[in-house]
Amino acid sequence: MSNFEFSVPCLFGLEGLAGDELRRLGIENVRVENGRVLFSGDARAMAKANVCLRTGERVLLTLADFKATTFEELFQGVYRTNLEDVIPKDGTFPVKGHCLNSQLMSVPDCQAIIKKAASKRLGEKYGVSWLPETGTKYQLQFSIMNDRVQLFLDTSGPGLHKRGYRAVGNEAPLRETLAAAMVQLTKYRGRDFVWDPFCGSGTIPIEAALIAKNKAPGMYRRFASEAFAWVEPSVWGDVRAEAKDKEFNGKYQILGSDNDPKCISLSIANARKAGVADCISFRDGDATKMDLPAQSGILICNPPYGQRMMEQRSAQQLYAALGRHLKFADGWKKYIITSEPEFEHYFGRRATKKRKLYNGMIKCDYYMYTDNQRKK
């Protein structure tokens, strides 16, 4: 097979960014939908998306798309799918997925039906009555929504947010894909001073450094499809070499600070693993008291929400103190994500713009202060 259809699930609110990334990578037929981005391409496009995407969650190869309201229709739809094109005779093919607003709502039953249909199809195509499943893992995923069944092959393995640089996070880490999106939404290109005053495990500064250097986030991790029989190993080598050639080597001003010394130590270790330690400075500091690190720049942060790390009232007091401290920081653009619906009130001024994003399952707003207006 030389041409495929792919689906890239995204955190809600990031679909447009992921679509733009795919287009910049030269990938064809990109279509943006709610919660995902679709594209067409060959194994090289698949590898490029896995290695280079910053805001997508994983890369799924679309195997089938059909309607089913009964288990028999589900079985027949899977049985008609050319699974032998992507799963070899000894391949291991576990099944997982989800159901929503459909006649078929039992995930375990749907898993069993899909597994049975896939086994029958592959057994007949390979002329065997029993499949050993001792070889490479080919993870099948299904989505049943409004009686529409979509069957996928996961080409990523661990989610794309797992860059490989964060072995251990702090108590409430920010997802790497969301951090990258937050940086992208500031239009940062490596020329401004970037400061995260609540850096935690360093995710925002690290993602900013990866963007500044144009360093592919998946350069040093492995992907499930690297072991697929129908993907030439040279594809991955070529994609990584091309990404390496496009990296920039400049001097960048990126600072991460936190009032917890343990977070600073963790951030330094993570930056080293990400290969960007030379681009970032980390230091202890109270965000509401420390001096501004430069006359102008971009502040990007994920302060405590009052849901996991602090009580809500304490978080609100923190927002007010931060607003007072930054009141005269006219040279700084400020980008702050929080689930607090009254953030602007506590911070002391209205945002120039705000955008709805999700941090895990938490619905948030990304407040963007891009002018020098000080009033509420």
Give names to the regions the model predicted.
Residues 2-136, 376:
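Non-catalytic nucleic-acid substrate-recognition regions in nucleic-acid-modifying enzymes
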Residues 10, 258, 338:
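Short beta-strand/turn micro-motifs composed of small residues
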Residues 53-55, 158-163, 167, 373-376:
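Flexible, glycine-/basic-rich loop-and-beta segments that form/coincide
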Residues 100-103, 159, 304-308:
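A short, flexible beta-alpha/helix-coil linker loop
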Residues 140-156, 367:
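C-terminal edge-of-domain segments
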Residues 151-185:
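SAM-dependent Rossmann-like transferase core, predominantly class I methyltransferases
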Residues 174-291, 307-308, 312-314:
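Conserved S-adenosyl-L-methionine
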Residues 287-289, 293-376:
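C-terminal catalytic and target-recognition region of SAM-dependent MTase-like enzymes
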